[in-house]
A protein has these predicted regions:
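Rhodanese-like catalytic fold shared by cysteine-dependent sulfurtransferases
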Residues: 2-60, 88-109, 124-182
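A short, well-structured juxtamembrane/interface segment
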Residues: 56-72
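Short hydrophobic beta-strand that contains or immediately precedes a catalytic carboxylate
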Residues: 67, 75-82
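Flexible, charged surface loops at secondary-structure boundaries
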Residues: 69-73, 105-111
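Hydrophobic anchor at the start of a short beta-strand
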Residues: 76, 113, 137-138
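Long amphipathic N-terminal alpha/beta scaffold segment
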Residues: 82-84, 88
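Gly/Ser/Thr-rich loops at beta-strand to alpha-helix junctions
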Residues: 118-122
């Protein structure tokens, strides 16, 4: 009798482990990013950004939707604050590297300037430093992740791309149809 009970408990424990692992890996083997639809990913990305924003509360934000409108009107300059490897995977339209902007911020007097990174934490810190120097610059709310989730396009050296550098597993929330890289 004790053996049957132990066998029963072992089988039950195995089933529970299987269920837990299935949940952990995102519905039985599917990557977590595929479990969520884009509206859920938006909520996650904007919630993460709101948490990060607490570290630079004085920084002015610009929403991806507002930035898209300014892009259509050719009135925005994007400053990519990510590392070169990330920028080689994809960038926002006509973005310049942080170093390029810092070397001559006066070069863009007629543009709204918006910095970004994966989720706009690093860019938020960058914007904070630039604001202390008297430079008017915004932080793209939610970064490149929110940008593609709101319908913005990204580019590599060959043109439009569906690859997006998400920095790491924690930020693996690309829009549907995008291939995450980290």
């Amino acid at each position: 009798m004790a053996i049957r009970k132990r066998t029963y408990l072992s089988v039950l424990a195995g089933i529970l482990c299987f269920i837990a692992l299935g949940w952990w890996y995102g519905q039985f083997g599917r990557p977590v990013r595929d479990v969520y639809d884009d509206s859920a990913k938006k909520r996650i990305v904007y919630r993460m950004y709101a948490d990060y924003k607490k570290e630079f509360p004085g920084v002015a934000d610009i929403s991806p939707k507002r930035a898209l409108k300014l892009l259509r009107d050719n009135q925005i300059l994007f400053v990519d604050t990510r590392e070169p490897l990330e920028m080689r995977i994809s960038m926002l339209p006509d973005a310049v590297a942080r170093e390029t902007f810092v070397s001559n911020p006066e070069k863009y007097p007629d543009k709204t300037v918006a910095a970004y990174c994966t989720i706009s934490y690093r860019s938020g810190k960058f914007v904070e430093k630039m604001m202390k120097k008297g430079i008017r610059i915004y932080n793209l709310e939610g970064g490149i992740l929110a940008w593609v989730l709101e319908g913005g396009k990204i580019y590599d050296a060959d043109g439009e791309t569906r690859r997006i550098h998400v920095y790491g597993k924690r930020w693996n929330y690309p829009a549907t149809g995008y291939e995450p890289v980290w």
